Amino acid sequence: MSTVYETLYILRPDLTDEQVELAIAKYQNLLQEQGATDIEVQNRGKRRLAYEIKKQRDGFYVQFNYNAPGKAIAILERAMRLSEEVIRYLTVKQEVTKEKEDKVAVTA
């Protein structure tokens, strides 16, 4: 069973645009390998952090919205935790509204 998730992560500011794109592709491929579907990627660009994280004041913000089984989240977060390029990440489960549930039931 798949659940809708949103993952937002921050990459180090000293990465080049090419390295940022490679990092995005790496995590997107990791999700696909774990059975994630409907992956939406939003590269929010370089932004100022509210406070210093790992001695960094800026970071590249990237957001994923996707459907995935629960085991995929543990694998994705483990990869991010071990990575030197990710300075912070957060995954939240999205609530499916009643309207969306009805729409899915009608189309099924």
Curated annotation (Swiss-Prot):
Superkingdom classification of source: Bacteria
GO biological process, one term: translation
Matching InterPro entries: Ribosomal_bS6, Ribosomal_bS6_CS, Ribosomal_bS6_sf, Ribosomal_S6_plastid/chlpt, Transl_elong_EF1B/ribsomal_bS6
Keywords from the named record: Ribonucleoprotein, Ribosomal protein, RNA-binding, rRNA-binding
Keyword Mitochondrion attached: no
Gene Ontology terms: cellular component: cytoplasm; ribonucleoprotein complex; ribosome
One Gene Ontology term of the molecular function aspect: small ribosomal subunit rRNA binding
Keyword set includes Ribonucleoprotein: yes
Similarity-based family: Belongs to the bacterial ribosomal protein bS6 family.
Function: Binds together with bS18 to 16S ribosomal RNA.
Protein name as catalogued: Small ribosomal subunit protein bS6
Species whose genome carries this gene: Trichormus variabilis (strain ATCC 29413 / PCC 7937) (Anabaena variabilis)
Organism placement in taxonomy: Bacteria, Bacillati, Cyanobacteriota, Cyanophyceae, Nostocales
Gene giving rise to this polypeptide: rpsF
